[in-house]
Curated annotation (Swiss-Prot):
Family: Belongs to the Rpn/YhgA-like nuclease family.
Purpose: This pseudogene is the C-terminal fragment of low activity DNA endonuclease RpnD which probably yields 3'-hydroxyl ends. The intact protein can be seen in this entry (AC B7NGZ6). Expression of the repaired protein increases the frequency of recA-independent recombination, but also decreases viability probably via DNA damage; in a RecA strain expression has no effect on viability but does induce the SOS repair response. May play a role in horizontal gene transfer.
InterPro entries assigned: Rpn/YhgA-like_nuclease, RpnA, Transposase_31
Organism expressing this protein natively: Escherichia coli (strain K12)
Gene that encodes the chain: yjiQ
Record-given protein name: Putative inactive recombination-promoting nuclease-like protein YjiQ
GO biological process annotation, one example: DNA recombination
One Gene Ontology term of the molecular function aspect: double-stranded DNA endonuclease activity
Source organism, top-level taxon: Bacteria
């Protein structure tokens, strides 16, 4: 099943994903059958919350382009409490909100979520902190790479950072294309 949550709503094209191929007939032969494309932008929230395990994802995908997700807190709390989302799902949810939503209000969002779910406060804060730390580490690595690329002395960098020879070697490797400009907003 494919989910659409683009900015145009409702989805303006065919809901059969095979029709999106340049040659739909060949696509049908290759993939045997079409699986449905669900336009979550037109599904009512009341219906989405009935979708159990995928409800969290669908609800966030539908509303992520709103710059203020605080209005969804009530529904998210109900889903998180009743569906017993695991750490992996909560991590994916928080990552998605942080990367796609309004980063400026992420901390406020986390604070309100934990205020309403005190029994899960430690778990949510641990996950949010881990996401924050991962971003911090990637930022440090990006700065160190830029220093190296712009002629900074590798021995000096190693001395002040305490990095091992292996870690320094990893910094000299080019970033994968998808990560090179990930900090730029489109």
């Amino acid at each position: 099943m494919l989910f659409y949550h683009g900015s145009r709503s409702p989805y303006p094209w065919s809901l059969c994903w095979l029709d999106e191929f340049a040659d739909p007939t060949t696509a049908r032969k290759l993939y045997n059958a079409a699986f449905p494309l669900v336009d979550v932008t037109v599904v009512p929230d009341d219906e989405i919350v009935q979708h159990r395990r995928v409800a969290l994802l669908e609800l966030i995908q539908k509303h992520i382009r709103q710059r203020d997700l605080m209005g969804l807190i009530d529904q998210l709390v109900v889903l998180l409490v009743t569906e017993c989302a695991n750490d992996s799902q909560i991590t994916a949810l928080l990552n998605y909100i942080l990367l796609t939503g309004d980063e400026a209000r992420f901390n406020e969002f986390i604070s309100e979520l934990t205020r309403r779910m005190p029994q899960h406060r430690e778990r949510i804060m641990t996950i949010a902190e881990r996401i924050h730390n991962d971003g911090y580490i990637k930022g440090e690595q990006r700065i160190l790479r830029l220093l190296l690329q712009n002629g900074a002395d590798p021995e000096w960098i190693q001395k002040i950072t305490g990095l091992s020879a292996e870690q320094m070697q990893a910094l000299r490797q080019p970033l994968p294309e998808r990560e090179r400009y990930s900090w730029l907003k489109s």
